[in-house]
């Protein structure tokens, strides 16, 4: 096993522990707490994959961080912060909407790369809006935290979430996954809309109805599916 992989996991475990202590003092805001929960799932998945104990890794990560901080000057810290690109966290959903449990009458699930797509195929003839919480860098979607599909009544009928055991995805991965979700929901005569925030950063264009323009690959796939059903 690569030593950098192990040490990276150890440092991530310790930094998560620090953030958890911060949250325990009721100092974290909603985006902070949301990332904390997501990262906990990711660390559990990585620990299982690597065969490493999280508690032991946390202690080792603390030693690594302490060694770095001993050599770190205030001036070097300022220069590091100044060189980082600005990262923004955008939220369409409230904390309650993100953490709410939901179930499907006719579940369908598909894994696309490192993203898991889930939808309820029992939903028909509804108006549905897609909302997402995600980070943006250089005016492009950088990391999807969670996307959910809501009916006008507020019921959750679909979801796209990163797989904890497979971290990392691109904005194109997200775009393609949303195309799959939209295609599945529209198949049952639902009308799907996308939030303005998601349109702005996940797509550069949309049609007049507020529906995103699907990527060419997704268009071809949906066209073939439609033709086969006629």
Swiss-Prot record:
Inhibits post-transcriptional processing of cellular pre-mRNA, by binding and inhibiting two cellular proteins that are required for the 3'-end processing of cellular pre-mRNAs: the 30 kDa cleavage and polyadenylation specificity factor/CPSF4 and the poly(A)-binding protein 2/PABPN1. In turn, unprocessed 3' end pre-mRNAs accumulate in the host nucleus and are no longer exported to the cytoplasm. Cellular protein synthesis is thereby shut off very early after virus infection. GO terms for cellular component: host cell cytoplasm; host cell nucleus. Keywords: Eukaryotic host gene expression shutoff by virus, Host cytoplasm, Host gene expression shutoff by virus, Host mRNA suppression by virus, Host nucleus, Host-virus interaction, Inhibition of host innate immune response by virus, Inhibition of host interferon signaling pathway by virus, Inhibition of host PKR by virus, Inhibition of host pre-mRNA processing by virus, Inhibition of host RIG-I by virus, Inhibition of host RLR pathway by virus, Interferon antiviral system evasion, RNA-binding, Ubl conjugation, Viral immunoevasion. Residues 180-215 are annotated as: CPSF4-binding. The lineage of its organism: Viruses, Riboviria, Orthornavirae, Negarnaviricota, Polyploviricotina. This is Non-structural protein 1. The gene is NS. Homodimer. Interacts with host TRIM25 (via coiled coil); this interaction specifically inhibits TRIM25 multimerization and TRIM25-mediated RIGI CARD ubiquitination. Interacts with human EIF2AK2/PKR, CPSF4, IVNS1ABP and PABPN1. The keyword RNA-binding applies. InterPro entries: NS1, NS1A, NS1A_effect_dom-like_sf, uS15_NS1_RNA-bd_sf. Transmembrane segments: none annotated. GO terms for molecular function: protein serine/threonine kinase inhibitor activity; RNA binding. Residues 205-230 are annotated as: Disordered. It comes from Influenza A virus (strain A/Chicken/Hong Kong/37.4/2002 H5N1 genotype X2). It is found in: Host nucleus; Host cytoplasm. One of its GO terms (biological process) is symbiont-mediated suppression of host mRNA processing. Belongs to the influenza A viruses NS1 family. It comes from the Viruses. Residues 1-73 are annotated as: RNA-binding and homodimerization. Residues 223-230 are annotated as: PABPN1-binding. Gene3D superfamilies: Influenza virus non-structural protein, effector domain, S15/NS1, RNA-binding. The dsRNA-binding region is required for suppression of RNA silencing. A motif (Nuclear export signal) lies at residues 137-146. A motif (Nuclear localization signal) lies at residues 34-38. Upon interferon induction, ISGylated via host HERC5; this results in the impairment of NS1 interaction with RNA targets due to its inability to form homodimers and to interact with host EIF2AK2/PKR.
